[in-house]
Swiss-Prot record:
Its main location: cytoplasm. Its EC number is 2.1.1.182. It catalyses: adenosine(1518)/adenosine(1519) in 16S rRNA + 4 S-adenosyl-L-methionine = N(6)-dimethyladenosine(1518)/N(6)-dimethyladenosine(1519) in 16S rRNA + 4 S-adenosyl-L-homocysteine + 4 H(+). One of its GO terms (cellular component) is cytosol. GO terms for molecular function: 16S rRNA (adenine(1518)-N(6)/adenine(1519)-N(6))-dimethyltransferase activity; RNA binding. This is Ribosomal RNA small subunit methyltransferase A. Belongs to the class I-like SAM-binding methyltransferase superfamily. rRNA adenine N(6)-methyltransferase family. RsmA subfamily. Pfam families: RrnaAD. It is found in: Cytoplasm.
Length: 275
């Protein structure tokens, strides 16, 4: 496989994190994993040169119910419009600032399916941005750096367990679906990739916790991950009775379950409300 940054006459741009999927066997496996069906509301993030876009359109799009796509590279937008016409509705702009809720069906029922080969240089901030629309989403299937996927699905007590693990596991059921080697791309990235499936918890399954407060606690806990929690959460010891919660501060951040972090955030919320 050539290391050239040019594919189909387009030069992959490093600032956009572009690596184009070219392995048709991998593409078929990804599409089968997604399982698109006619008439579904689906949005693709970063369609690139359309490697996934084409097979997705074949299976679900009609002129009345097109596939939606968010693309930042204006050179690619013109090519995609010319190739797919009315079967693809393109939204020019940065996915980090895009209002995905604007594409959801009216009402409270989740209706969106989101897919994409996400730019690896913005994957974590984009995943956090997408959390704000989780109540409108049926599922998400993303190609990501394998290391990121391993952190997303990591268990407590492992080195991969991180702030990203806690915040995403609080909101989604997640599963690593496929490994994708570098040679599946043009140009090949310097890392292995993987497909992850993310299914938001339904409202009745979600713990009653302010995600902002949860994020505050988790960020503090993982700020110095080699230190004990009695140090990283030291600022909260005068406010929260950790002993009453049964929360052992003689641990490191990666040894604490998602449910325990939620419990601390709930306690903090109650104290701030009372005070």
């Amino acid at each position: 496989m050539s290391n050239s940054r040019q594919h189909q006459g387009h030069f992959a741009r490093k600032r956009f994190g572009q690596n184009f999927l070219v392995d048709h066997g991998v593409i078929d496996s990804i599409v089968a994993t997604i399982g698109p069906a006619r008439g579904q509301r689906m949005v693709e993030i970063g369609p690139g040169l359309g490697a996934l876009t084409g097979p997705l359109i074949e299976r679900l799009a009609t002129p009345e119910s097109p596939l939606h796509a968010v693309e930042l590279d204006r050179d690619l937008i013109g090519r995609l419009q010319q190739r797919f016409g009315a079967l693809l509705e393109l939204h020019a702009g940065d996915a980090l600032a895009f209002d995905f809720r604007s594409l959801a069906a009216p009402g409270d029922k989740p209706s969106l399916r989101i897919v994409g080969n996400l730019p690896y240089n913005i994957s974590s901030p984009l995943l956090f941005h997408l959390m704000t629309f989780a109540d409108a989403v049926i599922d998400q299937h993303f190609m990501l750096q394998n290391e990121v996927v391993e952190r997303m699905v990591a268990e407590p007590g492992t080195k991969a367990f991180s702030r990203l693990s806690v915040m995403l596991q609080y909101r989604y059921v997640m599963e690593k679906m496929l490994d994708v080697p570098p040679e599946s791309f043009q140009p090949p990235p310097k890392v292995d990739s993987a497909i992850v499936r993310m299914i938001p918890y339904e409202p009745h399954e979600l713990p009653d916790v302010d995600p902002v407060l949860l994020g505050e606690i988790v960020t503090a806990a993982f700020s110095q991950r080699r230190k004990m929690l009695r140090n990283t959460l030291g600022d909260y010891r005068e406010t929260i009775d950790f002993d009453a919660l049964g929360f052992d501060l003689a641990r490191r951040a990666e040894d604490v379950s998602v449910a325990e972090y939620v419990g601390v955030a709930q306690a903090l919320a109650a104290l701030r409300k009372a005070g």
